[in-house]
Amino acid sequence: MRCVPVFLILLGLIASAPSVDARPQTKDDALASFHDSAKRHLQRLVNARKCCPESPPCCHYFGRRK
């Protein structure tokens, strides 16, 4: 009988958890994700190149040091 309240609480938590999209990733999805990641990394390098000569702390933020 002591387990019933715990069981009900866990059941409520499971029911209120956000659902996960179990759809498998297609080739187009994977390619789009790869392109987004590449764009993000290139933008980070461009930003580092712009600010590093002016601000050494900026270089440290972008993972580059003088």
Curated annotation (Swiss-Prot):
Post-translational modifications: Contains 2 disulfide bonds that can be either 'C1-C3, C2-C4' or 'C1-C4, C2-C3', since these disulfide connectivities have been observed for conotoxins with cysteine framework V (for examples, see AC P0DQQ7 and AC P81755).
Organism: Conus caracteristicus (Characteristic cone)
Gene Ontology molecular-function annotations: toxin activity
Tissue: Expressed by the venom duct.
One GO cellular component, as annotated: extracellular region
Signal peptide residue numbers: 1-22
List of residues that carry Phenylalanine amide: F62
Protein name from the UniProt record: Conotoxin Ca5.2
A matching Pfam family: Chi-conotoxin
Subcellular location: Secreted
Description of its domains: The cysteine framework is V (CC-CC).
Recorded family membership: Belongs to the conotoxin T superfamily.
Keywords carried by this UniProt record: Amidation, Cleavage on pair of basic residues, Disulfide bond, Secreted, Signal, Toxin
Primary localisation category: secreted
Propeptide: 23-48
Superkingdom of this protein's organism: Eukaryota
